[in-house]
């Protein structure tokens, strides 16, 4: 049950009869009259449960983007005048979610609520609150109707704007714009006849001896290599890098770097594996053979949040070993916290480097760099 501002106005209107006939009984009768009218109005108000409410499913969006929640409301039995609130959890950023409706019998309408999510993951609707007014507009029946709905918010992947230039650089390194010669990161491709200008070191003397012409080997960039991304979700990843809008969490910046690396590696024909964890492994995904690697990786990263605990690198190294003993490029996406590195990561590195090539990637904080390079006077301190 709810009352409206009209009840207050009706109470104030009681000043007139009290002035005309100043007595306590006059005031009591007026108050009783207002209460009775309000109760009758509430009883005559339609029941919110009679409304038919459905929600159009929402697709996934990236953090920073906006979307719209859309409700379809129909009144099958009688005319309806109500205030409808499409309630979402606070981080969904639901704005202008209160809608006034007036429906005739059998009429329907669509209510749109803009959403501007402020964090990753699955953000859910809390229900639809309907306040149905009586014919006098004094009172209303109110009820919250559960209408399921959610929106999946993926990592931003802001570095995708750098992807075209990085892919162009990759093509240059691959040898599509250069002579195919043997070197680190290449593998045998085919045999062909020698032409002037070829590197004599590429001559296949055994094949040349069996044929009447000089034959050289051609090389191509290695394919089907393994890249393992290991994302640290421990407490050190909860810190923020100063910037616009209050800064960006270190974890989100590491995700962005991992997505860019995965996109480039997949275009190069490499296999991508992903591990995320802290004290325990939170996620483990094998992305080999999948077309849209970045989309799958974003879906996996969406629910990851920093945990108030230190990273157990021995456990994470075991997860890497569980992917197979084939040599791989293992990229550790972790903040370079001296204590955490010394206590947990350094003892594990020899085990990883014994079978894999290891790269440690950390987010650079511009504010710390500016502080380190600044020279203050004694008065400034």
Predicted regions and their residues:
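Short beta-alpha junction loops
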Residues: 280-281, 363-368
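Acidic, Ser/Thr-rich peripheral helices and adjacent loops at domain boundaries
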Residues: 292-302, 367-381
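Extracellular/lumenal glycan-associated context and N-glycosylation machinery
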Residues: 1-54
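Short acidic, S/G/P-rich loop/turn micro-motifs used as interaction or catalytic elements
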Residues: 236-237, 337-341, 367
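Short, charged loop segments at secondary-structure junctions
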Residues: 283-312
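An amphipathic, basic-hydrophobic helix/alpha-beta surface used to engage anionic
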Residues: 33-291, 327-333, 347-351
């Amino acid at each position: 049950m709810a009352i409206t501002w009209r009840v207050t106005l009706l109470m104030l209107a009681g000043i007139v009869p009290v002035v005309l006939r100043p007595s306590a009984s006059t005031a009591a009768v007026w108050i009783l009259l207002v209460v009775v009218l309000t109760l009758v109005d509430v009883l005559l108000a339609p029941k919110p449960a009679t409304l038919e409410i459905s929600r159009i499913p929402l697709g996934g969006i990236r953090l920073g983007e906006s979307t719209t929640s859309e409700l379809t409301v129909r009144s099958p039995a009688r005319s309806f005048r109500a205030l409808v609130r499409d309630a979402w959890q606070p981080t969904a950023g639901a704005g202008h979610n209160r809608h006034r409706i007036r429906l005739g019998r059998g009429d329907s309408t669509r209510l749109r609520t803009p959403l501007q999510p402020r964090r990753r993951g699955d953000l859910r609707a809390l229900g639809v609150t309907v306040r149905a007014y009586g014919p006098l507009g004094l009172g209303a029946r109110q009820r919250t109707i559960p209408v399921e709905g959610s929106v999946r918010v993926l990592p931003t992947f802001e570095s995708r704007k750098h992807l075209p230039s990085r892919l162009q650089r990759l093509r240059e390194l691959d040898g599509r714009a250069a002579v195919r010669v043997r070197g680190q990161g290449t593998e045998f491709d085919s045999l062909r006849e020698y032409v002037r200008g070829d590197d004599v070191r590429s001559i296949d003397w055994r094949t040349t001896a069996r044929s009447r012409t000089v034959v050289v080997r051609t090389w191509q960039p290695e394919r089907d290599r393994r890249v393992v991304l290991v994302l640290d979700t421990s407490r050190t990843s909860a810190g923020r890098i100063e910037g616009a809008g209050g800064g960006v969490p270190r974890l989100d910046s590491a995700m962005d770097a991992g997505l860019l690396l995965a996109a480039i590696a997949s275009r190069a024909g490499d296999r991508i594996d992903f591990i995320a964890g802290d004290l325990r492994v939170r996620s483990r995904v094998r992305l080999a053979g999948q077309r849209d690697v970045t989309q799958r990786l974003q879906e996996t990263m969406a629910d990851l949040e920093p945990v108030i605990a230190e990273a157990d690198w021995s456990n994470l190294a075991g997860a890497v070993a569980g992917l197979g003993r084939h040599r791989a490029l293992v990229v550790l996406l972790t903040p370079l916290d001296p204590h955490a590195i010394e206590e947990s990561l350094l003892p594990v590195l020899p085990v990883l480097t014994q079978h894999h090539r290891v790269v440690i990637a950390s987010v650079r904080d511009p504010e710390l760099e500016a502080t380190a390079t600044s020279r203050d006077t004694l008065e400034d301190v």
